[in-house]
Amino acid sequence: MAKTLLFGEEARRSMQAGVDKLANTVKVTLGPKGRNVILDKKFGSPLITNDGVTIAREIELEDAYENMGAQLVKEVATKTNDVAGDGTTTATLLAQAIIREGLKNVTAGANPILIRNGIKTAVEKAVEEIQKISKPVNGKEDIARVAAISAADEKIGKLIADAMEKVGNEGVITVEESKSMGTELDVVEGMQFDRGYVSAYMVTDTEKMEAVLDNPLVLITDKKISNIQDLLPLLEQIVQAGKKLLIIADDIEGEAMTTLVVNKLRGTFTCVGVKAPGFGDRRKEMLQDIATLTGGVVISDEVGGDLKEATLDMLGEAESVKVTKESTTIVNGRGNSEEIKNRVNQIKLQLEATTSEFDKEKLQERLAKLAGGVAVVKVGAATETELKESKLRIEDALAATKAAVEEGIVPGGGTAYVNVINEVAKLTSDIQDEQVGINIIVRSLEEPMRQIAHNAGLEGSVIIEKVKNSDAGVGFDALRGEYKDMIKAGIVDPTKVTRSALQNAASVASTFLTTEAAVADIPEKEMPQGAGMGMDGMY
């Protein structure tokens, strides 16, 4: 296909127009008084959102060169979202500012490669200073503040803080759409997996159709149990001990199933059988997780295990087990805490090593089940449009909270960036164009606070000067129009989000400045359609 080419200033200006179109659309959402953007959807109602990356993903421009610029900045938002889960609007805004300031200097004759070196040096210094002013997250109150700022809603902040308190920092919190009007929290403590009882005759509560076992023993095997003779020696020991039994096996069928059900109905002893969760290698890993949690052993042919030789000390234990038609929940497994910790660390190492999104999700689920539980935030609203908007806000708040727990918090509202300006401005370079790069970052660091003020209908430059001349940590609360200590006021941003936004913006923007030629496809002209033939009298 034939290509069209642009060079030098013309190429950069065309791409900058695309950058500005995308960034100007996204940046109206920044801050407590930021507005929303409405996105047309081919199917269903339009989506109203203030999530930077969601807006950026929707933007495709007709002009090929403008679209190239827009796609580059979209990468800034996407990468920041992948790393930190929030801060995508800030990252887009910073990229626009660095590109704008950089292009002025490139047009004036500065060398873009040297400018890039200066930008890199300044960003490294800024990140170092941001980490110095970072404070660790202390308790539920800090978590609630981070989530409330991200979602612009104190109720959501409290809800996420409750969820994290219940499932722990390693626990999994998912966001789902609710059929009711309100937003609520549903917590599943302990380990739950999607396998129910193999026979309805095993239930202990016929009204709720569920089996609840207190202080049961847990038999874990990857074998199919069909011959009752394999189980008899173990069952006799369990009956003598007066214990209840949960069997997790590949399957329970035939004679074994009949015997277990008959004994349950006669009241000889209580036993519930469930199929092992997962498939293939994942099933083996999940059975090992259950064994670690309950302090049992997986009886498997792979390690020479035989059901006939199984003893009580091979079985796991738990405080309680609840089995429904669809799921099994093991609460407070009696496994060795040191072994559980080692298993958790092992899964974390696998998480770091894998590149598959699917594997990551499954490993994260396993981690949560071992480390505490799963919380589900059920989002409710009056209309589908409001529901989608709320769900995106909560997902952002959740990501921001996890980022804050990981690396700590800094003063919010763009204050952290303004606070590090003085230290970055002290950097000097003998090479003039590198110094230009440093100065570009110094100016760009003001941009988030300026935009937050602008979205609140105020003059950003005046506010920035006042914050610069105030004590460290003092910023501008755009919601109330007051200057205050941001951390004490609970206006905070996660360090990871603040750092990632700047690093990703600088990475893409500085590379953008080095562009000297742009190549794009020549758009195909549509051929005019021919006139229709007359078909009078034909039906």
UniProtKB/Swiss-Prot annotation:
Family of this protein: Belongs to the chaperonin (HSP60) family.
Enzyme Commission number(s): 5.6.1.7
GO molecular function ontology, one term from the record: isomerase activity
Catalytic activity: ATP + H2O + a folded polypeptide = ADP + phosphate + an unfolded polypeptide
Residues reported in the UniProt entry to bind ATP: T29, L30, G31, P32, D86, G87, T88, T89, T90, G413, D477, A478, L479, D493
Function comment: Together with its co-chaperonin GroES, plays an essential role in assisting protein folding. The GroEL-GroES system forms a nano-cage that allows encapsulation of the non-native substrate proteins and provides a physical environment optimized to promote and accelerate protein folding.
Domain of life: Bacteria
Places the protein is found: Cytoplasm
Species this chain originates from: Clostridium perfringens (strain 13 / Type A)
Binding partners and assembly: Forms a cylinder of 14 subunits composed of two heptameric rings stacked back-to-back. Interacts with the co-chaperonin GroES.
GO cellular component, as recorded: cytoplasm
Record GO biological process: protein refolding
Protein name per Swiss-Prot or TrEMBL: Chaperonin GroEL
Location (main, coarse): cytoplasm
Record key words, sorted: ATP-binding, Chaperone, Cytoplasm, Isomerase, Nucleotide-binding
